[in-house]
Swiss-Prot record:
Its main location: secreted. Belongs to the FARP (FMRFamide related peptide) family. The modification Phenylalanine amide is found at F10. One of its GO terms (cellular component) is extracellular region. This is FMRFamide-5. GO terms for biological process: neuropeptide signaling pathway. The keyword Secreted applies. The keyword Secreted applies. Transmembrane segments: none annotated. It is found in: Secreted. Keywords: Amidation, Neuropeptide, Secreted.
Length: 10
């Protein structure tokens, strides 16, 4: 999972 996608999880 890319950093941006990981951020979008929240």
């Amino acid at each position: 999972l890319s950093p941006t996608q990981d951020f979008m999880r929240f």
